[in-house]
């Protein structure tokens, strides 16, 4: 991470149907094979083709793990039971991030803008720290809130 990147926000690529499942609340955890830094509070989701844009921002809780003695996830969301039971399709997905809120960006950030305006060389393929220029120009909390926990 450079000083031109946010220490609290990351970009993660997301394919369909998973993005729709997050937006409509059926998927209430994001599962990853790696632990994000504890300072990360929000994920800006880059929707892959055909959307090719950052369209949603989610506030997240710190990582939950599935080590012996850990409290299992509530099994109300897609993938939660599989995470808890270590289903074979969930091998190595050892970190679960509870989605606390979902915001839709009123004017999605298109790939051409990410490249031209914000200096990203290509579409995000893995996790990327959010450029500070995006964080400073897009007020995440002023976007349209779709849902929030509690």
Where are these regions (language model features)?
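Structured alpha/beta reader/binder surfaces that contact nucleic acids or chromatin modification marks
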Residues: 2-150
């Amino acid at each position: 991470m450079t000083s031109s990147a946010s220490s609290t926000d990351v970009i993660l690529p997301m394919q369909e149907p998973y993005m729709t499942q997050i937006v409509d609340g059926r998927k209430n955890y994001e599962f990853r094979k790696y632990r994000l830094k504890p300072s990360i509070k929000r994920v800006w989701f880059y929707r892959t083709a055909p959307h090719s844009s950052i369209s949603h921002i989610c506030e997240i809780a710190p990582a939950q793990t599935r080590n012996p003695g850990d409290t299992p996830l509530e099994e109300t969301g897609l993938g939660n039971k599989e995470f808890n039971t270590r289903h074979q399709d969930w091998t190595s997905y050892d970190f679960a991030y509870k989605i606390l809120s979902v915001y839709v960006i009123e004017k999605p950030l298109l790939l051409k803008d990410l490249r031209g305006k914000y200096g990203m060389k290509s579409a995000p393929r893995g996790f990327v720290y959010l450029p500070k220029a995006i964080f400073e120009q897009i007020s995440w909390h002023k976007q349209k809130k779709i849902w929030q926990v509690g």
